[in-house]
């Protein structure tokens, strides 16, 4: 991953631009680590759902299978050094056991720059997410950026979870009819009690989704499943959703919003005030990593 350079020991001062650069680099490194902390928290919550399967890896980290046939929904999460062959063999055995047919269930393995041994095992780099963050506590963040046409409804029951799953599925470019395993996963996330699922609505029609994940002790909240179906993308729904996210996060006493953006989403998030922290390479046998 592209982690900012290690800070120099120089103290920052107006006469010391290297010190100021070191300070910015350290802030960027801490922000990048916060994104990974939040992602680990979110995936750990999914590990606890009865509909998911998981296993610890030798040397640290874990595998997570959500029941999906999409690589982007199944994860290996392991921080630190590039993986060794023992960890890769363990991950492949796990996802082979999860597969409904021949071969292994698809999955993504993020983080190690260059992939270490992963490409030798048929897991080349397939794309990159951009870790991003923005604050939500200053005066400029209190302005109403919402759209009066858009309302927001928290997902509080299974019926709401079913609609949320369908809207999110279409928001990521698929046609009607989300797969059954996705409905099961969303029902589990709704029942978790720690994750916050919200539906955006226009004229009583579901128009967008997002999920917020935040550890109780963390000053930050992470955004997941931020999705707007194509028919609502020119009606200001995404902008209204981001304004609602900032309001929810502030009300929860948090100071920062974190996310991992796909390439297509980066321009919107930059316009919404997010800053880039570093790239997260994704390694997979499949190409559906976003």
Task: Indicate residue ranges for each PLM-predicted region.
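A conserved beta-strand-loop-helix scaffold within acyl/acetyltransferase catalytic domains
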Residues: 176-229
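A short, well-structured alpha-helix characteristic of acyl/acetyltransferase catalytic modules
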Residues: 157-170
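Conserved active-site alpha-helix within GNAT-family acetyltransferase domains
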Residues: 114-125, 235, 239, 251, ...
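N-terminal charged segments
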Residues: 2-101
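Conserved acetyl-CoA-binding loop-helix of GNAT-fold acetyltransferases
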Residues: 84-93, 225-230, 234-247, 251, ...
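Acyl-donor-binding surface of acyltransferase catalytic domains
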Residues: 80-156, 261, 281-285
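Conserved beta-hairpin
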Residues: 54-59, 111-116, 120-124, 194-210
């Amino acid at each position: 991953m592209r982690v900012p350079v290690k800070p120099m020991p120089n103290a920052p001062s107006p006469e010391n631009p290297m010190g100021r650069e070191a300070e910015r680099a350290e802030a960027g490194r801490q922000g990048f680590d916060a994104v990974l902390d939040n992602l680990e928290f979110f995936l750990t919550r999914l590990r606890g759902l009865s509909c998911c399967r998981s296993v610890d890896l030798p040397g640290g980290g874990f595998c997570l299978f959500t029941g999906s046939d999409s690589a982007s929904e199944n994860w290996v999460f392991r921080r630190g050094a590039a993986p060794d062959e023992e960890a890769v063999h363990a991950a492949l055995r796990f996802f082979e056991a999860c597969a409904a047919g021949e071969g292994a269930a698809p999955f993504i393995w993020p983080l190690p720059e260059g992939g270490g041994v992963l490409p030798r095992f048929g897991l080349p780099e397939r794309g990159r997410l951009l870790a991003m963050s923005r604050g939500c506590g200053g005066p400029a963040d209190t302005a109403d950026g919402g759209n009066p046409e858009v309302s927001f409804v928290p997902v509080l029951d299974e019926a709401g979870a079913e609609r949320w799953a369908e809207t999110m599925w279409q928001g990521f470019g698929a046609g009607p009819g989300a797969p059954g395993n996705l409905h099961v996963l969303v029902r589990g996330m709704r029942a978790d009690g720690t994750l916050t699922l919200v539906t955006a609505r226009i004229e009583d029609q579901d128009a967008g989704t997002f999920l917020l994940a935040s550890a109780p002790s963390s000053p930050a909240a992470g955004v997941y499943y931020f999705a707007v179906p194509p028919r609502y993308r020119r009606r200001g729904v995404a902008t209204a959703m981001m304004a609602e996210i900032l309001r929810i996060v502030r009300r929860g006493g948090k100071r920062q919003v974190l996310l991992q953006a796909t390439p297509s989403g980066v321009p919107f998030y930059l316009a919404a005030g997010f800053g880039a922290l570093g790239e997260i390479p994704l390694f997979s046998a499949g190409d559906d990593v976003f």
